[in-house]
Amino acid sequence: MTVSLEERLLQNLAAPRADTRSVTPSIRAFAQAIDRQRAGLERVPLLAGARPDLATAARRLEEAEVAALAVELDDPQIELAAVSDVARASAVPLLRTDLLLEEFQIYQSRAAGFDAVLLVAAHLPDPVLARLCSAARSTHMAACVACATAVEIARAAQARADAIALPAAPAIAAELLAALPRRALILALTSGAPEPKHLLGRADAALDRALGAAADPAAAFRAALAEED
């Protein structure tokens, strides 16, 4: 994440609050889109919300048959409008991955067209984590909870997370895999391009920063798939 905790708190203080009555439920199922039953690994390109060609990159990735897209926002008040344009034209679900700390951000995300949100367990006390997961469910969004310890995985399960996001450097630690609830949907978090050989059979999908940062993400996506065949 490129925005610090302190920066996001300041942004939140100045952010307008969406009227929750006008927020419509998501109809694009992120969890279903990435669920490969561990038979394969879905790459989810992570695009920067400030990317000048965001709409074009998203459209071309959809044409390349990505299962889902992720977007990270540095300045939501500026970048959410571009996400809304993408969401209106997209048939694939959108995951928001930047720092979410307050309930209003969940409704803000859905109002912009996101279908899933990434929540970081380390930044959210139990009551807040439960409230944000509940808010996501109320709008039919998937709540993906990023966990770095077995304790955080247990907290995510208690909050009824739709998916567990785990660090992969390049593999997911055995102790984290052992702590997962049965049939948990797993999203691997990598610092660059995921390595399928380390993740196949262990994760359903992986955020791919390298694809999202490429000059032509769709071409990079197709090339990555060709290498796996």
PLM regions: where:
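Solvent-exposed, charged amphipathic helical/linker segments at domain boundaries
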Residues: 124-133, 145
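C-terminal active-site rim and adjoining tail of enzyme catalytic domains
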Residues: 167, 187-229
